[in-house]
């Protein structure tokens, strides 16, 4: 079924992929992404592990109503979370050759 050394090579490749994915997961957890809302009036910077690092609110919004400001903060956070997910998918695709793993599934299987 596998050529001479084929199974060993396959296992070695799987181990290398696992190591690259682990390194990538650490890299993603440490990266920072900034989400924006209100045309950049509210910015939320989060890590790849979804920890909020900074919230930036333009002073012009301090005079506006509280509910609108809360909505803008939530929208900026959601934008940052979406950007993290996109970055994770792009980086994982570069390692897995485009092979999509089910959500939450990590190497090794």
From Swiss-Prot:
GO cellular component terms listed in the entry, alphabetical order: bacterial nucleoid; cytosol
Domain of life, source organism: Bacteria
Cellular compartments annotated: Cytoplasm, Nucleoid
Region (Disordered): 1-22
Annotated Gene3D superfamilies: Nucleoid-associated protein YbaB-like domain
InterPro entries the UniProt entry points to: YbaB-like_sf (IPR036894), YbaB/EbfC (IPR004401)
Molecular function terms, GO-annotated: DNA binding
UniProt keyword terms in alphabetical order: Cytoplasm, DNA-binding
Described function: Binds to DNA and alters its conformation. May be involved in regulation of gene expression, nucleoid organization and DNA protection.
Subunit structure: Homodimer.
Annotated PANTHER family: NUCLEOID-ASSOCIATED PROTEIN YBAB
Family, similarity comment: Belongs to the YbaB/EbfC family.
Protein name from the UniProt record: Nucleoid-associated protein VC_1055
Provenance organism: Vibrio cholerae serotype O1 (strain ATCC 39315 / El Tor Inaba N16961)
């Amino acid at each position: 079924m596998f050529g001479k050394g084929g199974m060993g090579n396959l296992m070695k490749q799987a181990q290398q992929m696992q190591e690259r994915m682990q390194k990538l997961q650490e890299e993603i957890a440490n990266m920072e992404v900034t989400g924006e809302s209100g045309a950049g009036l509210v910015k939320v910077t989060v890590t790849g592990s979804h920890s909020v690092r900074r919230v930036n609110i333009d002073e012009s919004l301090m005079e506006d109503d509280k509910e609108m400001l809360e909505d803008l903060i939530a929208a900026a956070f959601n934008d940052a979370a979406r950007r993290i997910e996109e970055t994770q998918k792009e980086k994982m695709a570069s390692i897995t050759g485009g092979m999509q793993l089910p959500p939450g599934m990590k190497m090794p299987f």
